[in-house]
Amino acid sequence: MGEMDQYGNVNVSHLNGNLIGPGGFLEIAQNARKVVFCGTFDAKGSKIDVTPDGLHIAQSGQIPKLVTQVEKITFSAAYAQQSGQEVLYITERAVFQLTAEGVELIEIAPGVEIERDILPYMAFRPIIRHPRLMESSLFMPMEDA
């Protein structure tokens, strides 16, 4: 996932002025019943530690990926809504879901605080109802896994 915007659109093909090309992404993503985007919350320079208490964001990346409007729409949230697709956006810090009302924050990682580690690094405010905690076993240090 290169960028996601406040509407749930995703850009995977045109990042920072570089044309990458979507390949077969369009055919697969637009025709699937459920689409799960996975990627980091931000890019370039983030430093994240896995501790027994969960994630510790020592430094956020320099390039935000949750933006007001994507540079190019490779995945259309409006089309997904019209076709009844279920859409999830998974990052190490949070999980978002596309709803009829917009992008909703549905899960956060252990150790992450919404006001400290998520909202200041997003260009929009997602719908926040009752986000649950991600499964803590997902964040075990590699030597313990």
Q: What function would you assign to each model-found segment?
A:
Residues 1-144:
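Conserved phosphate- and dinucleotide-binding cores of soluble alpha/beta proteins
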